[in-house]
């Protein structure tokens, strides 16, 4: 299923590091490629809102920010980043999540994806889809292309994504979804096509309409949508009070709509499209006692982030916060950055702030793997690592090696 959290047990070198407790040496499985912070939307709930407002020179929190070296990684730098990621490929595994901003805002994205593919780097492509160049994206053979739809009517779509009346973005995304599904079918592409539905008070009454729009795509073009992923808006710790914040009652209403028997689930079930709920997004954050045994981060090394200016982040869940920057790839090789004193200093500082407990999004891959790794460390302290070895072997025997890291 396209949100799978056990892939690390398929990677022998990484398993060896975890079993030996060497988390600082754990090779990254993929990097979030935040190679542009330009986007045509101003979503009130945007996870990169603070980044686009404060953590990029000149800011990009408007609809028509010009592409520049201040906000977008250009071809020479992009190739250097890709070359360095390829050198860190371990267990035949290194990937890039092409995000942003929106990757379609970056004119260098598609050529970069082709170059990365030639270097053995897998790709995940996350986009609002309005300006998606379908065939150029499929040419790069990404593991998945996921379009953030969220709404099924023009008014709700405009309100949810924060753009002015009169713009034709909703009409465009309807066209692009159909083109993407049609071309996937015609090309017999292996790329998985996903649709995401993020829910809060602004669109909760429109989510069924979004499911009906997905049905219309399938009816008109064919069965080319592989999954739909659903979660409520996340109230991230770096959000300011005037950002869109979801209420618990909205989460409960959303859960009813998407769980088995609910109206959204019913539509997608009739289509045979898996509906994946990000469970932790619906659930409350763990209580304080959950972190009492140890609140240090152990999962920081598994997935990272490289920003538009070459800054390397400690983990993939810091959303560009400069407090988590451990170096710059244009000043020092990535391999050296990962071994550096600065990385240790940043790690010590964020552990001193109890980041895992107080900042890390509890629906994130980092938080999930922290939970797993802390259980392993508890078993180590109890002298039960033989049981951990057996558990890993059992998990490996009953799970698939997907060949990529994006659903972990």
What function would you assign to each model-found segment?
Residues 1-30, 45, 49-56, 311-408:
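Flexible mid-to-C-terminal extensions adjoining Fe-S/redox cofactors in radical SAM and related proteins
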Residues 1-136, 143-144, 246:
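Conserved alpha-helical substructure of the radical SAM core
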Residues 4, 12-13, 34, 50-60, ...:
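Radical SAM enzyme [4Fe-4S]-AdoMet core and its adjacent flexible, acidic
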Residues 32, 36, 40, 294, ...:
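Residues immediately within or flanking Cys/His clusters that coordinate Zn2+
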Residues 40, 110, 131-132, 154, ...:
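Alpha-helix N-cap/helix-start and coil->helix boundary motif
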Residues 90, 182-185, 342-346:
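Generic structural signal for secondary-structure transition and capping sites
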């Amino acid at each position: 299923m396209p949100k799978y959290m056990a892939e690390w047990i398929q990677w022998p070198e990484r398993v060896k590091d975890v079993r030996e407790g060497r988390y600082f040496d754990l090779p990254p499985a993929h990097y979030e490629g935040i190679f542009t912070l330009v986007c045509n939307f101003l979503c009130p709930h945007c996870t990169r809102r603070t980044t686009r407002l404060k953590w990029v020179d000149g800011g990009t929190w408007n609809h028509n920010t010009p592409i520049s070296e201040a906000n977008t990684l250009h071809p020479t730098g992009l190739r250097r980043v890709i070359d360095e990621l390829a050198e860190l490929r371990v267990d035949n595994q290194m990937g890039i999540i092409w995000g942003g901003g929106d990757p379609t805002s970056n004119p260098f994205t598609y050529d970069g994806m082709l170059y990365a593919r030639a270097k053995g780097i897998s790709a995940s492509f996350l986009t609002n889809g309005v300006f998606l160049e379908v065939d150029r994206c499929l040419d790069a053979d990404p593991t998945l292309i996921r379009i953030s739809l969220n709404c099924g009517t023009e008014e709700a779509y405009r309100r949810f994504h924060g753009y002015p009346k009169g713009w034709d973005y909703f009409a465009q995304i309807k066209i692009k979804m159909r083109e993407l599904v049609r071309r996937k079918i015609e090309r017999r592409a292996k790329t998985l096509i996903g649709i995401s539905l993020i829910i809060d008070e602004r669109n909760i009454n429109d989510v069924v309409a979004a499911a009906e729009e997905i049905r219309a795509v399938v009816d008109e073009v064919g069965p080319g949508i592989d999954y739909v992923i659903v979660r409520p808006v996340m109230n991230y710790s770096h959000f300011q009070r005037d950002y869109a914040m979801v209420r618990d009652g909205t989460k409960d209403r959303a859960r009813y709509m998407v769980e088995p028997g609910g109206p959204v689930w019913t539509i997608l079930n009739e289509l045979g499209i898996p509906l994946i709920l990000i469970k932790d997004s619906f659930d409350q954050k763990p209580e304080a006692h959950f972190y009492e045994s140890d609140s240090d981060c152990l999962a920081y090394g598994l997935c990272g982030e490289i920003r538009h200016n070459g800054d390397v982040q400690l983990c993939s869940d810091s959303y560009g916060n400069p407090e988590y920057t451990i170096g710059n790839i244009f000043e020092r090789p990535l391999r050296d950055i990962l071994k550096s004193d600065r990385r240790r200093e940043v790690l010590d500082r964020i552990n001193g702030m109890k980041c895992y407990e107080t900042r890390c999004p509890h629906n994130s891959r980092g938080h999930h793997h922290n939970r797993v790794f802390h259980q392993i460390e508890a078993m180590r302290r109890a002298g039960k690592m033989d049981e951990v070895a057996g558990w890993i072997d059992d998990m490996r025997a009953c799970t698939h090696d997907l060949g990529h890291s994006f659903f972990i």
